């Protein structure tokens, strides 16, 4: 048990020392994986299927908050779906608008949950985020997790 406490303190010191580098790298990886998975699973527009687009969007995501990244991912999905069917794009637009209103109305600090939930669903570990949020998050944190689950099933 003492070993875990020592490891925790060393991890806190490392994060405190290199916070300025760790946060943008994690945001880049989350953004890259998000846009790459959208391209791989939705990918109807050939101009956006370029492998460089997710890398550029990941770089952009490393400098903006998670909420804006989630909104850009929604717009990215809308552009792909509008290539096939404007009616379905309109339905998804209404859903993205409702998620945005709920998200910013309740708790804008939990944007990473909105991105991580569908991301981990695609990586075949679906119940990690809902379980962790249920055990350690607040009651309002359920909104981005539920929205992330709905987004996953829309993409599938």
Region locations from a protein language model:
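Short, Lys/Arg-rich, polar N-terminal cytosolic tail immediately upstream
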Residues: 1-17
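Hydrophobic transmembrane alpha-helices
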Residues: 20-74, 81
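Alpha-helical transmembrane segments of polytopic integral membrane proteins
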Residues: 31, 35, 113-116, 125, ...
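Transmembrane helix interruption/hinge and helix-loop junction motifs
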Residues: 46-48, 63-67, 82-87, 105-108, ...
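Hydrophobic alpha-helical segments embedded in the membrane of multi-pass proteins
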Residues: 49-55, 92-94, 128
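Generic transmembrane alpha-helix motif of multi-pass integral membrane proteins
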Residues: 54-64, 72-80, 98-103, 114-120, ...
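C-terminal halves and exits of single transmembrane alpha-helices
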Residues: 88-113
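Generic multipass alpha-helical transmembrane bundles of integral membrane proteins
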Residues: 129-156
